[in-house]
Amino acid sequence: MTGEEAGARQADSASKLYPEADVPSPSLGSAKDVKRWVRWVIPHRLSGREPVAMAARAQLRHGVGKEVGAIPSIWMYTLGAVGTAWNCKGEKAVHTALTLWARHQGSNAAPMHMVEAKGTPRSFGAAVRALAEKGRGDKRPEETPVFRRLSSVVAAPAFDALAHHLRGIVDLLEAAEMPMDYGLLAADLFEWQSPQ
């Protein structure tokens, strides 16, 4: 069985598990689209203690750092619907955001995808700032591991390098059990690919 056949087969079985009426349009052609898809797919298909959700998270963790589309078993999450024409920027943004979320969620009991914290959007920047403040102690901000890793993210010359450096910060966020909005991260990753 080819990768495409496996992905199509999984998408068919998923459509029986999840009613398509409540699924947002899987178009990934804009930052708004990728944000909406990630914000929908995490709570509706990937969260919880059900075996299907736990297996999906494990498969997504396996996809961290891998090429978009390299793992057919995660297509239904990272691509939305198999066989649809996709925007490459959208695919990369969703794949990266969801695989990093699965790594961040890890064995944490509390949800690591949070749209808001006390009424304020929980962006990547807000989560990193909270993490830096939490672990700062007597150090100056630029002396903290978070600052060094954030500097690597900011200086990333290519998308693959950006994703690699984001992984380091996600590991710190996981250890500190600090959630963030992965929909916003997906939108940021989409926009990063088209600098103005």
Predicted regions mapped to residue ranges:
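Long, acidic, intrinsically disordered low-complexity segments
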Residues: 2-66, 149, 168, 172
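Conserved aromatic-histidine-acidic binding/catalytic patches
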Residues: 26, 48, 63, 86-90, ...
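N-terminal interaction modules that seed assembly of large macromolecular complexes
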Residues: 40-101
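Amphipathic alpha-helical interaction surfaces
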Residues: 66, 70, 100-111, 127-130, ...
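Aromatic- and glycine-enriched beta-alpha-beta binding-site module
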Residues: 83-130
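Compact, glycine/acidic-enriched structural inserts
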Residues: 119-148
